[in-house]
Swiss-Prot record:
The keyword Ligase does not apply. PANTHER family: ACTIN (PTHR11937). It comes from Solanum tuberosum (Potato). GO terms for molecular function: ATP binding; hydrolase activity. It is found in: Cytoplasm, Cytoskeleton. There are at least 13 actin genes in potato. This is Actin-101. Pfam families: Actin. Its EC number is 3.6.4.-. The keyword Nucleotide-binding applies.
Length: 377
């Protein structure tokens, strides 16, 4: 690591739904692809076709009709390490086209990630990919960096999991972190269910991707759910049409806001959990009374599931209703919040003050995987 100046660190944000990867110092990830590994459902009969036993990311996505798709990350936490290794391999060699043994690698993890998981990540990086140095950072903390703050509460909601993470002067407060197993994938499932009730059939993993696209293009959060339902009944103002890959056209109306409403009312899908607004409030209430004012004034949204139009206004309205009446409440929804975890990682890994924080290969060889708990907190 003597000539560290000219070697850019790699930043890889492994999400449940998408992998975001690129070089530290860039303002956006170079590679963004789905966290999927697909294996053929049928055996190949065409000789010389060069069929692979596994496809990763976009290639798996484009051949989804003949593959069984698996997501190695569930609810933000890696559950299948062999597939995860395939994804990392694809990231380094095919997407970024770099040799990982020449670059330090910054990985991200979900808050409250099990200790064994961080160790396994560390072990794979050093032993399989031979990286010279690595670091594991908490996703929500990186989002806060990206918004230019060191204090605030981050609501990070991706495809697999949502978290509220209060951060004071750069330190996450672990006792007040709350996790909600309700995120983008559940909303996609919910929309699939609503559409199935209407007589459309969406069941396979490939069809789920169509519904996800429909959700991303058409769904929004209502400021007042009940009132919006009334409007939808009486007029066709909320109706929009969507063309399926086979040319069929679906018209969706109230479904557009019924689906993201689940974030605020998990009971709609039979979940006994508090909505994202209440979880955020509960998280703030678990913090010291002296810092709550700073948290209420810096509620930062991050992750793809916070991209719905109307979510920031609704969040602001709901939290204002829960908080003390004199409290000043500010919900920040940065336009780049889909990638703010990655951007925060890019900022962190390129800071000169961060360079002594890396776990080096030497330190790993000396202490083993448990070093990650001492150096990354």
């Amino acid at each position: 690591m003597a000539d560290a100046e000219d070697i850019e660190p790699l930043v890889c944000d492994n999400g449940t739904g998408m992998v975001k990867a690129g070089f530290a110092g860039d303002d956006a990830p170079r590679a963004v692809f789905p966290s999927i590994v697909g294996r053929p459902r049928h055996t190949g009969v065409m000789v010389g076709m060069g069929q692979k036993d596994a496809y990763v990311g976009d290639e798996a996505q484009s051949k989804r009709g003949i593959l069984t798709l698996k997501y190695p990350i569930e609810h933000g936490i890696v559950s299948n390490w062999d597939d995860m290794e395939k994804i990392w391999h694809h990231t380094f060699y095919n997407e970024l086209r770099v040799s990982p043994d020449e670059h330090p690698v910054l990985l991200t993890e979900a808050p409250l990630n099990p200790k064994a998981n961080r160790e396994k990540m560390t072990q794979i990086m050093f032993e399989t990919f031979n990286v010279p140095a690595m670091y594991v950072a908490i996703q929500a903390v990186l989002s806060l960096y990206a918004s230019g703050r060191t204090t605030g509460i981050v609501l990070d909601s991706g495809d697999g999991v949502s978290h509220t993470v209060p951060i004071y002067e750069g330190y996450a407060l672990p006792h007040a972190i709350l996790r909600l197993d309700l995120a983008g994938r559940d909303l996609t499932d919910c929309l699939m269910k609503i559409l199935t009730e209407r007589g459309y059939s969406f069941t396979t993993s490939a069809e789920r991707e169509i519904v996800r696209d429909m959700k991303e293009k058409l769904a929004y959060v209502a400021l007042d759910y009940e009132q919006e339902l009334e409007t939808a009944k009486s007029s066709s103002a909320v109706e929009k049409s969507y063309e399926l890959p086979d040319g069929q056209v679906i018209t969706i109306g109230a479904e557009r806001f019924r689906c993201p409403e689940v974030l605020f009312q998990p009971s709609l899908v039979g979940m006994e959990a508090a909505g994202i607004h209440e979880t955020t409030y509960n998280s703030i209430m678990k913090c010291d009374v002296d810092i709550r004012k700073d948290l209420y004034g810096n509620i930062v949204l991050s992750g793809g599931t916070t991209m719905f139009p109307g979510i920031a206004d609704r969040m602001s309205k709901e939290i204002t209703a829960l908080a003390p009446s004199s409290m000043k409440i500010k919900v920040v929804a940065p336009p780049e919040r889909k990638y703010s975890v990655w951007i925060g990682g890019s900022i962190l890994a390129s800071l000169s003050t961060f360079q002594q924080m890396w776990i080096t290969k030497g330190e790993y060889d000396e202490s083993g995987p448990s070093i990650v708990h001492r150096k990354c907190f």
